[in-house]
Swiss-Prot record:
Isopentenyl diphosphate binds at H41, H74, H124, S225, S226, N227, S269. This is 4-hydroxy-3-methylbut-2-enyl diphosphate reductase. It holds the Pfam family LYTB. It comes from Enterobacter sp. (strain 638). (2E)-4-hydroxy-3-methylbut-2-enyl diphosphate binds at H41, H74, H124, T167, S225, S226, N227, S269. Keywords: 4Fe-4S, Iron, Iron-sulfur, Isoprene biosynthesis, Metal-binding, Oxidoreductase. GO terms for biological process: dimethylallyl diphosphate biosynthetic process; isopentenyl diphosphate biosynthetic process, methylerythritol 4-phosphate pathway; terpenoid biosynthetic process. Binds 1 [4Fe-4S] cluster per subunit. The gene is ispH.
């Protein structure tokens, strides 16, 4: 049985930065460190940080005065940010810079009095944070998930209308929604550059190449990870059997029985150790050496806040 690895796969720059912020805060300030929401959507990462002293909460009221609070990579609304400011807390922001870019687009639209439409999944923390950047009572902020939602959407003034997208969506599905928006609201304005982040786009492109060769695709990622779910859906859409798994223990022998080629990828919040464990399990089930496919090289790095740079503190 051949094992192919999608390239790129796994951690993106925003996830790397968010995890480093929590790890460095624990090292510098000591436990406990409070984190609003799971810092990234991966069970292994969250449990590892919890064991080191991170406490994951959903409400700012759960955080004691005089402690450290970190916002997750998904971002928070202005209301949450203001609530944290009103408290005696030291706050660090692990929001992915590419999510912050979308926040700024919404805030600009709000200041200009434009109505805004966000393409995204209801209930996802990134969506809640992005929707919460809009504050103009004269305008409006709307959420759509599908072309069908666009057909039933009513706005106040379609001459002053803009759209943004969640960063972890399906590229294909989002394109369909944007087409529907432009058809329904011809004057709508979108971002200069697509809001779907480079890592989401690259990993979907990579899983497309993987699914062309593999009989079965395993996506390493947690069930609440938006970008991981999109990878599994894309492989399935290409006619391949695909499974979203937290780790190697989820693999069932029947999935790969009599299979010639298994493809493995990982969502942007899944660490490489989980991929290595999956490879080891597949090799126990008859797999050969893992062969990485060619793909886009990623060199993007997002710096952690200066106060949390371990190297800088050591130099001082």
């Amino acid at each position: 049985m051949q094992i192919l690895l999608a390239n790129p796969r796994g951690f993106c720059a925003g996830v790397d930065r968010a995890i480093s912020i929590v790890e460095n805060a624990l090292e510098i300030y000591g436990a406990p460190i409070y984190v609003r929401h799971e810092v990234v959507h991966n069970r292994y990462v969250v449990e590892s940080l919890r064991e080191r002293g991170a406490i994951f909460i959903e409400q700012i009221s759960e955080v004691p005065d005089g402690t450290i609070l970190i916002f997750s990579a998904h971002g928070v609304s202005q209301a949450v940010r203001n609530e944290a400011k009103s408290r005696d807390l030291t706050v660090f922001d692990a929001t992915c810079p590419l999510v912050t870019k979308v926040h700024m687009e919404v805030a600009r639209a709000s200041r200009r009095g434009e109505e805004s439409i966000l393409i995204g999944h209801a209930g996802h923390p990134e969506v809640e944070g992005t929707m919460g950047q809009y504050s103009n009572p004269e305008g409006g902020m709307y959420l759509v998930e599908s072309p069908e939602d666009v057909l039933t959407l009513n706005v106040k003034n379609d001459a002053k209308l803009s759209f943004m997208t969640q960063t972890t969506l399906s590229v294909d599905d989002t394109s369909d929604v944007i087409d529907a928006l432009r058809k329904r609201f011809p004057k709508i304005v979108g971002p200069r550059k697509d809001d779907i982040c480079y890592a989401t786009t690259n990993r979907q492109e990579a899983v497309r190449a993987l699914a062309e060769q593999a009989d079965v695709v395993l996506v390493v990622g947690s069930k609440n990870s938006s970008n991981s779910n999109r990878l599994a859906e894309l492989a399935q859409r290409m006619g391949k059997t695909a499974f979203l798994i937290d780790d190697a223990t989820d693999i069932q022998e029947a999935w790969v029985k009599d299979v010639n080629c298994v493809g493995v990828t990982a969502g942007a919040s899944a660490p490489d150790i989980l991929v290595q464990n999956v490879i080891a399990r597949l090799q126990e089930l008859g797999g050969g050496d893992a062969i990485p496919l060619e793909g886009r090289e990623e060199n993007i790095v997002f710096e952690v806040p200066k106060e949390l740079r371990i190297d800088a503190r050591e130099v001082e």
